[in-house]
Design a protein with these regions (language model features):
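Extracytoplasmic gate region of multi-pass secondary transporters
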Residues: 25, 201-254, 258
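Helix-breaking motifs and short loop linkers at transmembrane-helix boundaries and internal kinks
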Residues: 36, 68, 86-94, 106, ...
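Helix-to-loop junctions at the C-terminal end of transmembrane segments
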Residues: 56-68, 253-265, 351
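Cytoplasmic helix-loop-helix junction between adjacent transmembrane helices
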Residues: 97-139
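Helix-loop-helix hairpin linking two adjacent transmembrane segments in secondary transporters
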Residues: 124, 132-179
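A late C-terminal transmembrane helix in Major Facilitator Superfamily
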Residues: 318-354, 363
């Protein structure tokens, strides 16, 4: 059986996994109305999906030293199915919160297991396949709001009934294809989670600092983007749609970036992406007028989504077989933790009286210093990373 078909089933799963995380945001108003809760509780429900996504990454990495990649992906599919069904059937807020957290857990387990597995399925095309896989994920972010709009014509719970059915079917297809496909045994030597992670600590740290801090700025920007645009004088409806523009710009970015990640030196390429993102943030700040703001938003959306397949390729292509899953799990957990506070920091700064322009320019300036430091270290040959065949990063 073709590995491409197996990869296709993983693209279907990642679409559903990411859809399950992002679909809660358009439903906040429905939760407030149906369950008679306040904005804070509704916000907590949305947050639980992302907390759940971060929580299992280290345990999932350990599980990959005991069980096959395919089995852990199967578990994530079952968790997604059960979580989606739980949300659809939730009679009250406690059940809804538990089910939402379960959906988040499923996504965290999936990412930690699937990304190394995909890199091992196509070791000579890591960037391209990570780009395609990421593009499938990004399509879910674009589709979430329209799907919810259609579901609301009838009942918002229909979106989760449909998600549960699709997750169960996609998981079954993945299992069937995995059984018929000759899969690599690259991960069989990765049996000591702590030793594997410790052996690659320099590479993990390099990845977490650069991609984590960039994502920190991104989290702070996009979660306040609508309010920022309104503050700049953009109409409320238009401001809301600008987020869709940003996410839509990310769809081709994954594919383009994945291809380039296979061809260009990892660290200089990453620094180029982050620098371009910084330019986009500055353009958003200085832009005036709708056309200029839309153009700047496209730059931000395209460049930030280029980062994700490039960062994954940097790690996965540089890690040796005997530590790939363990080290990637630690990197993934570290990056999620680093970026998580971005929205909180921006919110606190705005509440303290700082202006949006000043906050985002300050964040961009801080990130520019990080890029400069990496450029100096890369010139001196001090940033780890290279081909996996070369052995552990030094």
């Amino acid at each position: 059986m073709s590995r491409s078909r197996l990869f296709g089933s993983l693209c279907a799963l990642i679409f559903l996994v990411n859809f399950a995380r992002v679909v809660f945001a358009p439903l906040v108003g429905e939760f407030i109305g149906e369950f008679s809760i306040g904005e804070g509780t509704a916000g907590l429900i949305v947050t639980l999906a992302w907390l759940g996504s971060a929580a299992p990454r280290l345990p999932a990495g350990w599980a990959l030293t005991r069980f096959s990649r395919q089995f852990v992906i199967l578990v994530s599919g079952v968790m997604l199915t059960v979580g989606a069904l739980g949300v659809a059937l939730a009679p009250g807020v406690p059940t809804l919160m538990v089910a939402t957290f379960a959906i988040g857990l499923a996504s965290g387990v999936y990412f930690v297991a699937a990304n190394p597995f995909i890199a091992e399925l196509f070791p000579t095309r890591v960037g391209r396949v990570m780009g395609i896989h990421g593009m499938a994920s990004q399509l879910a972010a674009v589709a979430a709001a329209p799907v919810v709009t259609v579901a609301l014509w009838y009942d918002w719970r229909l979106a989760f009934y449909g998600l549960a059915v699709a997750a169960a079917a996609s998981t079954a297809v993945f299992v069937a294809l995995a059984r018929r496909t000759e899969v690599p045994d690259a991960g069989e030597s990765d049996t000591d989670f702590f030793a594997g992670a410790l052996s690659e600590w320099k590479l993990i740290l390099a990845g977490v600092v650069l991609t984590g801090l960039t994502s920190f700025v991104w989290q702070g920007l996009f979660n306040f983007y609508e309010l920022y645009m309104i503050d700049k004088g953009i109409a409320e409806a238009t401001a809301r749609n600008l987020l869709t523009v940003i996410f839509a710009a990310g769809v081709p970015a994954f594919l383009v970036s994945g291809d380039l990640a296979d061809r260009l030196p990892h660290v200089p390429y990453l620094l180029g992406i982050v620098s371009s993102f910084l330019v986009g943030v500055v353009l958003v700040v200085v832009a005036s007028g709708l056309v200029a703001v839309v153009a700047a938003s496209v730059v931000v959306g395209f460049t930030i989504h280029m980062l994700f397949p490039a960062g994954d390729t940097y790690l996965l292509a540089s890690l040796p077989d005997e530590s790939r899953a363990s080290a990637y799990a630690v990197f993934s957990a570290g990056m999620m933790t680093t970026q998580a506070a971005g929205s909180w920091v921006v919110g606190e700064a705005i509440e303290a009286g700082a202006g949006y322009d000043a906050v985002f320019l300050s964040l961009a300036g801080g990130l520019a210093l990080v890029v400069a430091a990496y450029a100096v270290l890369e010139y001196a040959g001090r940033v780890p990373g290279g081909a996996a065949a070369a052995g552990p990063a030094q």
